[in-house]
Amino acid sequence: MRVIRAVATLHAGRAAAVRQGVRSVSLGACRAAVETPSLRSAGSQFESRRLFSRSSYLRNANMTAAEIALKQAKELAASNMTPEAAAARMTPEEAKRLARVRNIGIAAHIDSGKTTVTERILFYTGRVKAIHEVRGRDGVGAKMDSMELERERGITIQSAATFADWKKKEKGVEETYHINLIDTPGHIDFTIEVERAMRVLDGAVMVLCAVSGVQSQTITVDRQMKRYNVPRISFVNKMDRMGANPWKAVEQINTKLKIPAAAIQVPIGSEKELEGVVDLIDMKCIRNDGQRGVNLKISKEIPAEIKELCEQKRQELIEKLADVDDEIAEMFLEEQTPTPEQIKAAIRRATIACKFTPVLMGSAIADKGVQPMLDAVCDYLPNPNDTDNTALDRSKGEQPVKLVPYNSLPFVGLAFKLEENPYGQLTYMRVYQGSLKKGAYLYNSRGNKKVRIPRIVRMHSNEMEDVNEIGAGEICAVFGVDCASGDTFTDGGLPYSLSSMYVPDAVMSLSIKPKRSSDADAFSKAMNRFMREDPTFRLHVDEESEETIISGMGELHLEIYVERLRREYKVECETGQPRVSYRETITQKAEFDYLLKRQSGGPGDYARVVGWIEPNPNGGEDNHFESRVVGGTIPDKYISACQKGFQEACIKGPLLGHKVIGSSMVITDGATHVTDSSDYAFNLAAQMAFGKAFTAAGGQVLEPLMKTTISAPAEFQGNILMLMNKRGTIVDTEVGADEFTMVADCSLNAMFGFSTHLRAATQGKGEFSMEFSHYAPAPPHLQKELVQKYQKELEAKRTK
C-alpha cells in the first residue's frame, strides 16, 4: 500500500505540475507540488476520483511507478481541461488535421439537382470513376441513390453519407481536405432526414435552381439551417437551362430567406452557351475543359461583354460584406480597396457567423462550376474547431458545456441516424470530442448502459470501409450498438447529454394490415424497424376499431413505407383511406362540478371536483393544469391524479377522438370520502368533468392547413386558379417569363388525389409541394359531418 500511496502522490503532483506547464518533474518535486497549498487540491481530486486503484496498479505491474504516474497524470489532466486549455494544448498535427476537415450537407428544394451535384463532387474527388445520373436512366443510377425506389422515382428518400478528399491549391501548394458529405432529400415528406443531418453538420451547400430561385422547400431547408446555426454557401445550379437568372436567385436569398447574400462569381455565357464563371475575388475566368469538365482553364482575360458587369458585382460584394463584417466596413468607410485575401477572410468570418452566404454558379449536369464550389467549401465553411458545439452537464443542472474536437479529451458522440443492415443495426454517429477506437466501451447517457463498439465503418452511400479508429470532429457509423436516434454516448467519465433534433408532428394517417395472416411476424418486424429508423413514422392500434394505424408526413411518405413492406419484407398489405390528423380545442370558459360516486359491494369510488376549463390563457397549443384548492378539500396526493386525468382526457377528445390542444383546466374545490377516495377515482373524475364541460366550452375541430406551392407553365394559370379556389386561400402568386408559381394555404382534407387533378389541368407539366403550415378551425359544415360520422362509428361499435 505504501507503494500505491507513493505513486498516488507522484501522480497528483505530476497532474498539478502538468497544469502549470511543467513538462518534466521528479518524484521529490511532485511531492513538493502536492504539499503546496495552491496545488493540494490535485491530490484530493485524485483521491475522490479514485483514478488510480489497486486493480489498475496490478494491471500496469510491468510499468515503472513513474510511467504509471505519467500515464495517469495525462488522463487526469485531459479530463480536467477547459475548452480553451484543450485548444491551446492541441498538437500542430491535430490542429492541421482539424483545419482540413469539413462536415457538410447538400440541401435544396426537390429537383434542384442536389444528387447530381453530389455525383459530380464524388467524380471530381476521385470517389467514383464514372458519372451516373438520377432515375437510373443508364441502368446504374446516381451513387448516393442506393435504394431501388430512389432510382425508379428519381428522388432521394433517405439521406446518404459519404466521404471524399479534395486536393486544393493554396499559394502554389496542394492541400488535401477531408470532406464528410451527406446528401439529403428535397421532398417535404422526408424532412426528418434533413433535420437530423443539419443537427450534426458544421456547414452546408444550399442548392438553388437558376430558373425557379427560392422555392417552398428552400425556405424549409433555410429554417432548418437556422435552427441548428449551420453556415451555408449557396450554389445556383442549372445555369444551362433556358430562362436561367442567377440574379433573381441572389435577390430572393436576400429578400425571402432574409440572409445577406452576394455573388462571388459571374457566369460566362448563358443557357446552352454556358462556358464557366468569373471569380470576382481574384477577377479571373474559370472554364471547364476536357471530358466531363475535369480540367480547369484559368485566365485573367475577362470577356469584354461582361467586364463591366463583373466590376459592378464585385463592388456589390464588397458593399454587402461591409454590412456584415467590421474590418471590411472600416476599409469601406476609409475608401480603401480590400485585397483578395482580405475579401476571402471576411467572407469566411461572416459565413461562419451565419451573417452571410456567398453565392456561386454553375450547372452540375453540364459539368460546369463544381470544382470552384468545392474550393469554396474549403475556403468558407467551418472546420469542426470553428463551430460552437455544446453539451448539457447533467451534474450541474444541465449547464451548457462547450465541446472541443480534441482526441485526448473524454469521448462525446451523438447517434443521429439508425439503419437496418444485413449485418445488424447500423448507427450513424458524429464524434464531437475525443476519439473512438474499435473494441472500446461507451456509455449511453440514456440509462447509462455500457456498450462495446465491435466495428467502426466509414460510409460511402451503401458501401462500407472498415476503420480501427475515428478522430474528433468526424462522422462514422458503428455496428452492434442498441440505441435510439438522438442518444448521447460518452466514455463514462462525463455526465453529458446532447440535445436531440426537432421532430415534427405527423399530419396524415391510414389503416393498414397484412393480406395474409402468415405475414404478421414479418409485418411487426418491419414496423418496429421503420419506427426505430424514422421518428416521424408512427404506429398505434386504435382501441375501438382494433385497426393498426400508421401516421406520417404525407401521402408519399406512407406510400413509400407500404411499398418497402412489399419489396423488402414480401408483405402485401391492405390500406384504408388516408386520414387527416385533426385536433380539438375549446373556445370559451365553462364551469364544472362533477361527482363520481360508485358502489359495488366492496370499497367504492368517490371523488368530487369543482372548477372550470378554458382556452390556455398563455396561448399556444400546450395544455395547462392548475390547482387553486384551498383548505385541503382535495389532498395534494389526489391533485396529481387530477392532473394526470386531465392529460389523459386530452389524448382523445370528445368530438372526434383526436388530440386536444390549447386548453386549460383549473380545479378550485372538491370533496373526498374516508374509504372510497383514491388516485383512480380522482383521475377518472377529472376525465369525466373535462368531457362533460367540453361541449359547453365551445368544443371545436381544428384541421391542418398545408402551405402548398404549385409551379407550372404560364399558359395554365387560369386552370390552376380554378383548382386552388376550391381547396384553399391563395397567399401569393409570382409570374415569370415562362412559368408561374402560386402559394396557397389548403385544407389537407381537400388535397387527397390533387396530383391527378393537377396533371389533367396542366397536361402533366405542373408540379406541387406541400408542407404543414398550422391548425385552423374547420368549417362548420365539415365539423358537423365529422362529428356525426364519429358518433355513428361509436354507436356501431356499442351495438356489436
From Swiss-Prot:
Keywords: Elongation factor, GTP-binding, Mitochondrion, Nucleotide-binding, Protein biosynthesis, Transit peptide
Name this protein carries in UniProt: Elongation factor G, mitochondrial
Main location: mitochondrion
Organism the protein comes from: Neurospora crassa (strain ATCC 24698 / 74-OR23-1A / CBS 708.71 / DSM 1257 / FGSC 987)
Recorded metabolic or biological pathway in which this protein acts: Protein biosynthesis; polypeptide chain elongation
Listed NCBIfam families: EF-G, PRK12740.1-5, small_GTP
GO function terms (MF aspect): GTP binding; GTPase activity; translation elongation factor activity
Stated family: Belongs to the TRAFAC class translation factor GTPase superfamily. Classic translation factor GTPase family. EF-G/EF-2 subfamily.
Transit peptide residues according to the UniProt entry: 1-59
GO cellular component terms listed in the entry, alphabetical order: mitochondrion
Chain residues that bind GTP: 108-115, 183-187, 237-240
Subcellular location as annotated: Mitochondrion
GO process terms (BP): mitochondrial translational elongation
Gene that this sequence comes from: mef1
Domain tr-type G: 99-385
